[in-house]
Amino acid sequence: MGSLSIWHWILVIAVVLLLFGRGKISDLMGDVAQGIKAFKKGMQDDDKPADKPEPAKSIEHNAAPTAARSDVGSKAV
């Protein structure tokens, strides 16, 4: 009583075909296949090594000499 016989499965498949139709099921399976292909392609893209970044360019900075401040440590009254 707890197991489904072959007749139960045939009835379930017949109801599914009547509800969805043959065209909708094949379209659905095609969409699933495209999704799997896109997923596999995305996983393969992750395996490729990343492009090596160019080394950073150095910036030459000529700082002008500044005058020393004498009031650095004093408090204003």
UniProtKB/Swiss-Prot annotation:
Q: Which residues form the signal peptide?
A: none
Membrane-spanning ranges:
1-21
Q: Where is this region: Disordered?
A: 42-77
Q: Extract one GO cellular component term from the record.
A: TAT protein transport complex
What is the membrane topology listed in the Swiss-Prot or TrEMBL record? Answer: Single-pass membrane protein
Checking InterPro entries in the record gives:
TatA/B/E, TatA/E
The protein in question is named Sec-independent protein translocase protein TatA
